[in-house]
Amino acid sequence: MNVSKTEQDMRKAIEATAGNFATIRTGRASTSLLDRINVEYYGQPTPLKTLATITTPDASTVLIQPYDPSSLRLIEKTILESDLGLPPSNDGKTIRLNIPPLTAERRKDLVKVLRNLAEEGRVAVRNIRRHAIDEVRKEEKDAKVSEDEARRLQDEVQKLTDKSIQQIEKLFEAKEKEITTV
């Protein structure tokens, strides 16, 4: 049983959760808002950032300039169908997303989405823990490790799990504060 691999997997789960948090809009324009957007381009789901230049000319605008002008309509349609809640404005060459100030109701909705993303991260960490502990038990059953060593490894995995869940909780609290601050 390799504890460092378990630690690495948990770190990846935390990074994935942080990446998901970055896609939640906070009232300020950010290119990371569009990180999860995949456009159906020639039958393939393609990340928007590979189809267009995405910039933030000011604090309340995201500008999308497609490399291929024919993809403009597809990008616009995908953004409309996404959970961003931002209506795109298409001028024929670029798409603008104007980021309105968040309403109290929208802030509450975003915190709910954030809470769900945090829970997904915690579940991922727990699944990694379960897999690691199953591996330790299998090694103990196969007499590859002693009962004491198995207990020590399980305790170590549990400590990593607690630490990882605590990190996800800190990320959640910081992002929640960012969203709820007017």
Curated annotation (Swiss-Prot):
Native source species: Gloeobacter violaceus (strain ATCC 29082 / PCC 7421)
Family: Belongs to the RRF family.
Cellular compartments per GO CC: cytoplasm
Keywords of the record: Cytoplasm, Protein biosynthesis
Protein name from the UniProt record: Ribosome-recycling factor
InterPro entries, A to Z: Ribosome_recyc_fac, Ribosome_recyc_fac_dom, RRF_sf
Gene that encodes it: frr
Listed NCBIfam families: frr
GO molecular function, one term: ribosomal large subunit binding
Pfam family, one: RRF
